A protein has these predicted regions:
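Intrinsic disorder/low-complexity segments
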Residues: 4, 22-24
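Bacterial N-terminal signal peptides
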Residues: 11-22
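Sec/Tat signal peptide C-region and signal peptidase I cleavage site
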Residues: 25-29
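Mature catalytic domains of secreted/periplasmic carbohydrate-active enzymes
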Residues: 30-510
Length: 510
């Protein structure tokens, strides 16, 4: 982003804008108070601001769980069936036929009786999400495969009538809301139009008897039909009416949906929320909805620097791109997950972390341990995450994200050091989170008081600082502020693991 040269600190300008977005009442609240009615036009829908609960909550969890959890084959479990039907030479097709027989005799639909979810317990899932420190959570309501995870009137191919024979979305909605978390419903079903080759009569996906699962039969390059678009919108509205989600998350595929259908869906959701006097948010992938109509989502990515706009990223606990459960797939370590949460929040972002449960409804032990580890870290350091806003700069340090612009730039090989620091602020407090143990002393160069001709004064002054402590320790630390920066003596013992928060209390609010 290019900034005009002026007598204003550009970092301060970004942080001020980001802070004002929190302090100004959200447009949902304003709209509800004024009795605003949204029209199905981009002009009417383009005044959305992120709800206060999301700006304060920062961290959420969602799940990819469905029929694709039965074969549990990677690299991407949720695209397994697509590869099986479309690519005869793919590893997925070879695995399918070697394990289950010819595709002509055993198709994707035949996994449904095996998707029994006999150990699924919505209360246990919600309890785990709460212990992990999540402030919002929920399931994928329907993925590209056409199998709905709620009791829908639009198709008999759903979890309430087949497979588990349980209303998974409904059970999770009740369990999550009971724990005062906001409820998330994720939709990926726009890409159902392209997911199966329904024109191919050799396989069950081309059989009209199974079109409720595989989708409307159409020619290879046909545009989405009115019947498909009506069903796409109808399913979302049904979930809104039945389960009242606080966040509706959209995957790629919205570019396939005609503008009028997207406009009608958004207007319905926002008007319903206003009638219910609640704040809601819709997320979207880049270039699929106009700016201002929802919140930008960066898949497995993050911004390189502090942004004036807020954003959310969806990432996953595994080291690849499995999303759903994949047998034998490795997991990230807790350092990586904690560091990524801290980094995103410092840059005006939020994290929606995915877990892929097994077909029986259990969450893998490795994933469970990671979530509980996140919760333990947040118990000590959540003060530097929840309810904070960005500072004038996201941070400092030698480790930089240099790949890509936002989407798919996540790096599992990124290793932060004891000199990598990320900043957040709340009230009179500046939180400097170090992404590895800094040793005996920490030097924060960004806090050196200095004058620059076109930015003015920056940093802090000794007279401004009331005290410095480390979260989890609480004892006042010795410090010295010089032209090199703020030098802080660290505690003798580490109060936690993974990342360490210095709380700098200032006499006046930031």
């Amino acid at each position: 982003m290019k900034l005009l040269k002026c007598n204003v600190n550009p970092g301060l300008l970004l942080a001020t804008i980001a802070t004002l977005a929190v302090l100004v009442p959200s447009s949902e609240a304003q709209g509800a108070a004024a009795g605003k009615h949204y029209e199905p036009t981009w002009n009417s829908l383009s005044d959305r601001r992120t709800p206060q609960w999301l700006r304060e909550g920062k961290f959420g969890i969602y799940t990819h769980w469905g029929v694709y959890s039965v074969p549990a084959m990677g690299p991407n479990a949720t695209w397994y069936a697509n590869k099986v039907y479309w690519e005869p030479d793919s590893s997925e097709r070879k695995h399918q036929e070697q394990t289950y027989g010819p595709l002509e005799k055993f198709g994707y639909k035949d996994f449904i009786p095996m998707f029994t979810a006999e150990k699924f317990n919505a209360e246990e899932w919600a309890d785990l999400f709460q212990k992990a420190g999540a402030r919002f959570a929920g399931p994928v309501a329907e993925h590209h495969d056409g199998f709905a995870m709620w009791d829908t009137k639009y198709s008999e191919w759903n979890a309430a009538k087949m497979g588990p024979k349980r209303d998974v979305v409904g059970e999770l909605a009740r369990a999550i809301k009971k724990r005062d978390m906001k409820f998330v419903a994720a939709f990926h079903h726009a890409e159902e139009w392209l997911y199966f080759p329904t024109f191919d009569k050799r396989y069950d996906c081309g059989d009209p008897r199974y079109s409720g699962l595989y989708g409307f039969i159409h020619e290879k390059n046909a545009l989405p039909s009115k019947a498909f678009l009506d069903q796409w919108k109808g399913k979302i509205i049904e979930v809104i009416d039945k389960y009242d989600p606080d966040l509706v998350w959209f995957d790629n595929g919205l570019e396939l949906i005609t503008d009028s259908y997207k406009q009608e869906m958004l207007a319905y959701y926002y008007n319903k929320a206003a009638a219910r006097k609640k704040e809601v948010v819709v997320t979207y992938k880049r270039n699929t909805l106009p700016p201002g109509t929802g919140l930008l989502d960066l898949e497995r990515g993050q911004e390189a620097d502090l942004t004036y706009y807020d954003w959310i990223t969806d990432s996953t606990v595994d080291i690849g791109r499995g999303w759903g459960y994949v047998k034998g797939l490795g997991f990230k370590n807790l350092d990586n997950l904690v560091d990524n949460l801290v980094d995103r929040v410092s840059k005006n972002g939020y994290l929606l972390l995915n877990v892929g449960p097994k077909a029986d409804g259990t969450i893998p032990d490795e994933a469970r341990a990671l979530l509980l580890g996140m919760g333990e870290w947040l118990k000590v350091n959540g003060e530097a995450i929840y309810g904070t806003t960005p500072w004038v700069t996201a941070g400092e340090g030698p480790t930089r994200l240099v790949r890509g612009e936002g989407d798919f730039n996540e790096r599992n090989d990124l290793r932060y050091t004891g000199k990598d620091i990320r900043f957040t602020v709340k009230d009179n407090n500046l939180y400097a989170t170090v992404l590895d143990w800094p040793g005996d002393r920490l030097l924060i160069k960004s806090l050196a008081p200095r004058w620059e001709s076109w930015t003015g004064w920056s940093g802090l002054y000794p007279s401004e600082i009331v005290s410095i402590t480390m979260l989890g320790d609480g004892k006042k630390l010795e410090w010295k502020l010089t032209e090199e920066g703020l030098s802080i003596e660290t505690p003798k013992a580490q109060p936690c693991q993974h990342a360490f928060v210095f709380k700098i209390v200032r006499r006046k609010p930031f």
